[in-house]
Amino acid sequence: MLPVNPRDLEKMMRRLGIKVEQLSADEARIVLGSGETMVFRSPTVIVMRAKGQPPMVYLVGDYTVEKPREETAAEITEEDVALVAEQAGVSMEEARKALEESGGDIAEAILRLKGEE
């Protein structure tokens, strides 16, 4: 590659209508379609703008990939099941199923069961 003077490069880009801006950032995150997140720590962020084109953003630096957090299932206790069964007047199995469907929300489970009667 030929050595290029940074000043000359800047002049050439200006003539072409390209503006370059460097930003400082502590962290940059990109959320991927798979749910994973690329985390750049102390990246160099370069924004290039050309006339009539959307800006191009370059992230330069090391990154890590974070896996998506798995939602933990709501903990359903026997006391919750008994309360729902008593309030809705249904069996323990029906009460447990309603609690699982409502994500452990007791009030929602009772309302669902009373609405089904």
Curated annotation (Swiss-Prot):
Classification via Pfam families: UBA_HYPK
GO process annotations (BP): protein transport
Cited function: Contacts the emerging nascent chain on the ribosome.
Every NAC-A/B domain range: 3-72
Family statement drawn from the similarity comment of this UniProt entry: Belongs to the NAC-alpha family.
NCBIfam families: archaeal-type nascent polypeptide-associated complex protein
Keywords, ordered alphabetically: Protein transport, RNA-binding, Transport
Name the UniProt record assigns to this protein: Nascent polypeptide-associated complex protein
